[in-house]
């Protein structure tokens, strides 16, 4: 099958979350990868049960699906790294009572799209160091909802866990595939 690469940037017109589009476009084109900029918006009052961060993320994801379909693509590679995945795991456990996170590969049949996360085993610190070495320009982040986000709190939790155990991130990663159902409440027919 053919591989079509695109660098897609989805902007939110109603949030002052800025990226240097010329820089991103230039970098992408230097690699021979076409750059697509797509703008959308969301109204945080449409669903007060969901956080603005969730609504923004979901609307950006839908926009990515739209662009992918328009470009004739059926696979989207996202830049989530190991820290993102572990922070999401901790958020879902803490706030949703669910043992779930962002998988490295997710087939979304409803959209006929597959999401992959090729950097899922890379530490955020390693990406920051690589960006520094390569001289990448830091992008502007000025989201009015960022201070309300639980993700920054979970980043601190992950850091605290690593202070207690330097291998904590690897233990968290391993626990996602090392579920001992017989030792969990509600998983055994004889429980409660």
Residue spans of the language-model regions?
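Alpha-helical elements of Rossmann-like donor-binding domains used by nucleotide-donor carbohydrate transfer enzymes
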Residues: 23, 63, 156-157, 171
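Catalytic subdomain that performs nucleotidyl-dependent activation
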Residues: 75, 83-163
